[in-house]
Structure formats: C-alpha cells, structure tokens
C-alpha cells in the first residue's frame, strides 16, 4: 500500500511539474503597457532560482495610488489608477498579498496564492460590491500557438454583468458571460486588425469598444474592464511577447 501511494504521489508531482513548465517562457518577455515597454526574465531562468514573477494592475477607479506587499516585503509602491507595473520576482511558493492605500499602514484587502516556480501572475486590484477593494490573482500564459495571437478579457467593473466579447464583423463571440471579478481564460485568434466589442447584460447600454487593435502573431493581449457602477466603463490594455519582437498593442 505504501509503495502504491508513493508511486501515485510521484505521478501527481510529475504531472504538476509538467503543467507548471507548460506556462513558463523559454525566453525573456517584453511587456507593453501605456506606451512603456519593460523586459522580464524567462520563466526557465526564474524557475532555476526557485522564483515566480508577479505584476500589479490598479483597476480601482478611486484616483488613489496603492501599495501591495507580499513575500515579506513591499512589492509595488504608489501605483496609480490604470497603471500596469513591470513583473517582480518572489521567492516563496505560498504568498499572502496585502493591498494598502499608498503610504498607509492598514491593509484594505488581502489574498493568498500558491505560486509555481517560473510562472507569471497578474494581481488585479478592483472594486468590490460595497465600494471597497479586493484582489484577483491570475496566472499568465502568454505564448500563443504558432502563428496566432492570444487575447483575454478581465471583468473588473461591477457595472458590467455577464460580458460578451466579440470582434466587430465576426458572427461568433470570443467569450460569453464573463461575470464581474472573472476572466474566461485566453483564446488564440488569427492575427488581424479589428475593433473589440464588449457588451454587458443590459440591452439598453452601448457596447464598450476597443478600436482598431492590431493583433500580431506571437503576442498575448489583455483587456481589463474597470469603473464604478455609476461611472462609464474604462479599459486598461497591455500585451506580452517573448523577446524577438516588442511592438505593442496598437490603438489608432
């Protein structure tokens, strides 16, 4: 019985390792956000040091900057609304992240996550249903299939329920019913230039348009919906690609 359990445990460990390796990048990664390009290490390099990587998106539309701590230190300081930080490395596998108003001592939200060595993660700070703050931690899988572009949409706006996402002019949606605080994972698409149309469940509301996005092969594009219930929805956009081409999300 002991030998059987040991064998099963070993198989599970191998499977987990293979799954985690599949999300790693072989090369360093260029991220374009807000017109700025940053470079982060390869997943293989980070894994060799027993580290993972994490970044922060401030989707809290309160016009206040935020700090986030984790791994027993401050990871991000004075991050303004709609800002996407560069990746930083963390060494612990179980990390409790805490969200603070900038330069304040009392946290307003926290979240714990199991971080796999060599993997990349995005923390999204977003409003909760009661006007406070919460955090979602999402794993980044940024390498699309050969010749494809990759897209994901994160719904961080309490005013948008069950979002449907489509490329204008195409019959079938890319994603359906993305609820608030959720994302529907990534989808690989044929490279194209198109307007992304996002609709909530209110038939009387106008669609949210991200116009003339140039989806390039080899790139992963993220769109974050943000805004309070009483204010217009805004979008935060950024893209990632393994080095070898660093041109970013084109909005004309």
Where are these regions (language model features)?
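Sec-dependent bacterial lipoprotein signal peptides
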Residues: 1-18
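Intrinsically disordered, low-complexity polar regions and short flexible loop motifs
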Residues: 20-252
